[in-house]
């Protein structure tokens, strides 16, 4: 199973890529994290947030792996603990499908995409830069995996 992070945005600062890569490389071969960047829609005064999100939805859907479990990150999503994520990983692995975590653009995710997702997940009640969410998600996926392996990284 592969874990895909499909994220609207590009040209992230170097420290974002460094942080993301650090956690992605720690993952075992059977649970690799792959980042798929989606170009954000150009914004102009004549474009509504809905039209921007709809255009980004089409790009996101094109980047999603076929038959992947879609987990949309959304401020109104469910709050999960790291332990809940750790419990989900083995179940997802048994299911055999790839998992795609979707990070929207500045306006969020299109409602059609959110309704397609099997899970709406909130990463934090705080407002975070989207690039930082990539790093945070990669770290939490690594931490969840380390819990399933009784690895000393997680010391709760």
Curated annotation (Swiss-Prot):
It is an enzyme of class 2 (transferase). It comes from the Bacteria. InterPro entries: Alpha/beta_knot_MTases, RlmH-like, tRNA_m1G_MTases_N. The keyword Lyase does not apply. Its EC number is 2.1.1.177. It is found in: Cytoplasm. It catalyses: pseudouridine(1915) in 23S rRNA + S-adenosyl-L-methionine = N(3)-methylpseudouridine(1915) in 23S rRNA + S-adenosyl-L-homocysteine + H(+). The keyword DNA-binding does not apply. It holds the Pfam family SPOUT_MTase. Signal peptide: none annotated. Keywords: Cytoplasm, Methyltransferase, rRNA processing, S-adenosyl-L-methionine, Transferase. S-adenosyl-L-methionine binds at residues 73, 104, 123-128. GO terms for cellular component: cytoplasm. GO terms for molecular function: rRNA (pseudouridine-N3-)-methyltransferase activity. Belongs to the RNA methyltransferase RlmH family. Specifically methylates the pseudouridine at position 1915 (m3Psi1915) in 23S rRNA. Homodimer. This is Ribosomal RNA large subunit methyltransferase H. It comes from Burkholderia thailandensis (strain ATCC 700388 / DSM 13276 / CCUG 48851 / CIP 106301 / E264).
């Amino acid at each position: 199973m592969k874990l895909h992070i499909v994220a609207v945005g590009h040209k992230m600062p170097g420290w974002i890529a460094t942080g993301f890569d650090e956690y992605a490389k720690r993952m075992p071969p059977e649970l690799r994290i792959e980042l798929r960047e989606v170009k954000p829609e150009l914004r102009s005064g004549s474009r509504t947030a809905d039209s921007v999100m709809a255009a980004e939805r089409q790009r996101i859907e094109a980047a999603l792996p076929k038959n992947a479990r879609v987990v949309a990150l959304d401020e109104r999503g469910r709050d999960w603990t790291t332990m809940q994520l750790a419990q989900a990983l083995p179940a997802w692995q048994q299911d055999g499908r790839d998992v795609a975590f979707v990070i929207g653009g500045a306006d969020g995710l299109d409602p059609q995409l959110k309704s397609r997702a099997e899970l709406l997940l909130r990463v934090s009640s705080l407002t975070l830069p989207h690039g930082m969410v990539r790093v945070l998600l990669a770290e939490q996926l690594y931490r969840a995996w380390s819990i399933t392996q009784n690895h000393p990284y997680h010391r709760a």
